[in-house]
């Protein structure tokens, strides 16, 4: 049976944990050695020493490919966590030294990334000009996955985050967004009833987008089958839909953050649908298990407290709280 060492006598080194991970990734001692720029005998010796110290066999060497034993899988699992903490320690020290300098990686779903984030980033940059900001705009699911994988600091999305990803994240309601039906300025349609929607020529995003799914759910609740809508055109971006509507190709449900100013300036005509209101929540999300740099912490605090850098909410967006 393995005898636990004293607290200050760990039975492994970080180099040994790096070697275990490399062998698991590469499937052989030689390739692991190549990836670490050391000799194969040095890798073998470190593994032998680690197995002797732990009193277990970590790798099955009988096949063509080296495989982890059950004990090896346990060691790999905790090795990943230990090495992750080491990386975060380095990040935290660098962040402490840099103070006002840093890098912030944000994620957003399409509507949020196009119409909400530019205003937020501009205000943040005015307060912290030395912090560089990177914005990734993808679907809600992809953004949530990147948060879980530790590739993003903070994200704001409009769609529902899948439960299997949400349980790894801290998710908070940030704002409410409304969708309105719009047509070209000269559109002859006036205040259509719900049943009239079936006869209108629609321009939409693809069915997999969170925007389309939100609209479809609300229409279903009001007795309108989205599959029966006359979808004249499916496009991949909100701006493309706006251009198509302005060209008179049809009508579209669009977020007020995307068209509110355009409606006010007469570039679109808002068509009030009797008895229909489509609202959705915008979600602020981050990974609580990931080290948050000072740049990310300041961004989060500004959004949550409405202080520091956030002076003016994005136009046509109602912040919650």
Q: Which positions does each model-derived feature cover?
A:
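C-terminal effector-binding regulatory domain of bacterial HTH transcription factors
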Residues: 1-11, 221, 256-265, 275-321
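A short LG(V/I)-centered, amphipathic sequence patch enriched
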Residues: 51-73
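Alpha-helical linker/hinge and terminal dimerization helices associated
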Residues: 53-54, 75-97, 299, 310-316
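Central regulatory/effector-binding core of bacterial HTH transcription factors
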Residues: 101-164, 318-319
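C-terminal regulatory
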Residues: 141, 168-247, 261-278, 306-321
């Amino acid at each position: 049976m393995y005898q636990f060492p004293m607290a200050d006598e760990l039975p492994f080194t970080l180099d040994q944990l790096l070697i275990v991970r490399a062998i698991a990734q590469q499937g052989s001692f030689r390739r692991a050695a190549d990836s670490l720029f050391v000799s194969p005998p040095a890798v073998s010796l470190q593994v032998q020493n680690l197995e002797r110290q732990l009193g277990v066999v970590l790798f099955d060497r009988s096949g063509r490919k080296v495989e982890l034993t059950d004990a090896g899988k346990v060691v790999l699992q905790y090795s990943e966590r230990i090495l992750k903490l080491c990386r975060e320690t380095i990040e935290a020290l660098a962040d402490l030294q840099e103070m006002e300098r840093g890098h912030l990686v944000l994620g957003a779903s399409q509507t949020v990334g196009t119409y909400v984030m530019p205003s937020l980033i501009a205000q943040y940059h005015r307060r912290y000009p030395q912090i560089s900001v990177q914005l990734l705009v993808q679907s809600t699911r992809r953004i949530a996955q990147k948060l879980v994988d530790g590739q993003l600091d903070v994200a704001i999305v409009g769609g529902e985050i899948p439960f299997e990803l949400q349980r790894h994240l801290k998710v908070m309601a940030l704002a409410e967004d409304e969708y309105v039906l719009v047509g070209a300025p000269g559109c002859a349609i006036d205040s259509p009833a719900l049943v009239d929607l079936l006869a209108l020529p629609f321009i939409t995003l693809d069915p997999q987008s969170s925007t389309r799914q939100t609209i479809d759910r609300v229409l279903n609740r009001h007795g309108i089958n989205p599959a029966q809508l006359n979808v004249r055109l499916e496009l991949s971006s909100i701006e493309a839909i706006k251009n198509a509507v302005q060209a008179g190709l049809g009508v579209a449900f669009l977020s007020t953050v995307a068209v509110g100013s355009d409606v006010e300036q007469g570039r679109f005509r808002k068509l009030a649908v009797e008895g229909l209101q489509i609202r959705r929540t915008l979600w602020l999300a981050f990974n609580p298990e990931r080290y948050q740099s000072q740049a990310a912490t300041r961004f989060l605090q500004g959004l949550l407290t409405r202080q520091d850098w956030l002076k003016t909410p994005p136009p046509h967006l109602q912040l919650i709280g």
